[in-house]
Design a protein with these regions (language model features):
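Rossmann-like dinucleotide/phosphate-binding beta-alpha-beta segment
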Residues: 1, 133-159
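Structural motif
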Residues: 7-12, 32-33, 54-56, 76
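Short, well-ordered alpha-helical microsegments
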Residues: 14-15, 38, 59-61, 151
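A short, Lys/Arg-enriched amphipathic alpha-helix followed by its capping loop at the start of a domain
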Residues: 15-27
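Rossmann-fold NAD(P)-dependent oxidoreductase module
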Residues: 20, 113, 153, 157
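Structural alpha-helical scaffold elements that stabilize or flank donor/cofactor-binding regions
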Residues: 21, 43-44, 63-66
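A short beta-strand-loop structural module common to alpha/beta enzyme folds
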Residues: 27-36
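Phosphate/diphosphate ligand-binding glycine-rich loop within oxidoreductases
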Residues: 49-129
Length: 159
């Protein structure tokens, strides 16, 4: 259990998720604006042992050195690689701070959206039809640009 969690900027939690935080932490502080600089981030974190941030702010070595209470940082944004992260994960590791990001969130919704739009285009549901006659998805040859997680899931759904 954590003592204090601070979301240093808006992290887009739904109300039920905000309530659920109290299962893991005694005190929760959620900021609804983006901090201007490292000094503001340090002030917001204070003595918190858990921190949440989105993609707009950065927690670098200077912040980590001045916030010795941090044990956990939750990145409420994509974490593609340690090198591209907006948290100095390598330095955090040397301080025993666990940093977790979100991977592959929203991918199922992307697949559903693509299939919905493709069906609409092929059958003219809510938009002009691509061809003169409706076309079935089954057996359709489709090119997908990018075969990351979403691209692979779309390919699987169309297979």
């Amino acid at each position: 259990m954590f003592e204090k969690l601070v979301a240093i900027e808006p992290v887009s939690l739904i109300p039920s998720a905000e309530k659920e935080l109290f299962q893991y932490v005694k005190e929760v502080v959620l900021f609804d604006d983006i901090p201007a600089d490292d000094d503001e981030i340090i002030r917001r974190i204070g003595n918190a042992d858990a921190v949440l941030l989105s993609y707009t702010s950065r927690i670098g070595r200077a912040v980590l050195e001045r916030c010795p209470s941090i044990r956990y940082i939750g990145m409420c944004c994509s974490l593609y690689s340690e090198e591209s992260a907006n948290v100095d994960i390598a330095f955090a590791r040397t301080k025993g701070i666990r940093v977790l990001g979100i991977r592959d969130y929203g991918d199922r919704g992307v697949v559903e959206y693509v299939l919905h739009e493709l069906t609409g285009l092929l059958h003219g549901f809510g938009m002009p039809m691509l061809h003169d006659e409706p076309v079935e998805i089954t057996g359709l040859k489709v090119g997908i640009v990018g075969l990351g997680v979403s691209g692979k899931m779309i390919a699987d759904a169309l297979a």
